[in-house]
Amino acid sequence: MARGPKKHLKRVAAPKHWMLDKLTGVFAPRPSTGPHKLRECLPLIIFLRNRLKYALTGDEVKKICMQRFIKIDGKVRTDITYPTGFMDVVSIEKTGENFRLIYDVKGRFTVHRITNEEAKYKLCKVRKILIGTKGIPHLVTHDARTIRYPDPLIKVNDTIRIDLDTGKITDFIKFETGNMCMVTGGANLGRIGVITNREKHPGSFDVVHVKDSIGNSFATRLSNIFVIGKGNKPWVSLPRGKGVRLTIAEERDKRLAAKQSSS
């Protein structure tokens, strides 16, 4: 019988979007407990070593982190298996680089560089709103932040913009039709579009219909929707492709066209 927390993660059982090959070893870094779920996060070590190629081994990542070079959401993190997740801002002051963890249309975390100006804030989805002790209202976000005394107009599923220096809410976007959203789970993970309508199913999952910028429509559960902008204006910069998923044939044609133009 297992007693206590699991401390290991086999490479074969690691989430597919980490893109670890099966033959390099037996184990994968098991993310520490933190603000994002194990299957929905990217450990810091994989981001620095496998994505940015700033280190060759786990030991080198540890040396980088222990020199306090890496900040996540404005806080220094020295744990190499710290779970970074959707919308987190990773800053490396030594190189003057800032990254926002955001999904590409294949559902993987992409290396998305952002400006210093954009690195000062992040967007968070409101998961719960509760009244705490002594009648103090709280809201809980997707990255496990608890914020007291929020604006009473903010409801569950809305998106708030948080200033990372102060941790205060500076603005918010309502969850409503016509707003821009990104899908953060399910088969359409990473796609971006405008909310067209919401089907309510009491006792089951609400379904949201989304239309992307080239006119393709798709539907997903309400829990997978993350509002990222008012109307067609996103509040964060978007990765290449702008969240439009192409069919296999369209991707092939695009590759061939790029090949011909370069030759």
UniProtKB/Swiss-Prot annotation:
It comes from the Eukaryota. Residues 42-105 form the S4 RNA-binding domain. Transmembrane segments: none annotated. CDD domains: KOW_RPS4. The keyword Repeat does not apply. GO terms for cellular component: cytosolic small ribosomal subunit; nucleolus; small-subunit processome. It is found in: Cytoplasm; Nucleus, Nucleolus. InterPro entries: KOW (IPR005824), Rib_uL2_dom2 (IPR014722), Ribosomal_eS4 (IPR000876), Ribosomal_eS4_C (IPR032277), Ribosomal_eS4_central_region (IPR013845), Ribosomal_eS4_central_sf (IPR038237), Ribosomal_eS4_KOW (IPR041982), Ribosomal_eS4_N (IPR013843). GO terms for molecular function: RNA binding; rRNA binding; structural constituent of ribosome. GO terms for biological process: brain development; chordate embryonic development; ribosomal small subunit biogenesis; translation. Belongs to the eukaryotic ribosomal protein eS4 family. Component of the small ribosomal subunit. The ribosome is a large ribonucleoprotein complex responsible for the synthesis of proteins in the cell. Part of the small subunit (SSU) processome, first precursor of the small eukaryotic ribosomal subunit. During the assembly of the SSU processome in the nucleolus, many ribosome biogenesis factors, an RNA chaperone and ribosomal proteins associate with the nascent pre-rRNA and work in concert to generate RNA folding, modifications, rearrangements and cleavage as well as targeted degradation of pre-ribosomal RNA by the RNA exosome. Component of the small ribosomal subunit. Part of the small subunit (SSU) processome, composed of more than 70 proteins and the RNA chaperone small nucleolar RNA (snoRNA) U3. This is Small ribosomal subunit protein eS4. It comes from Danio rerio.
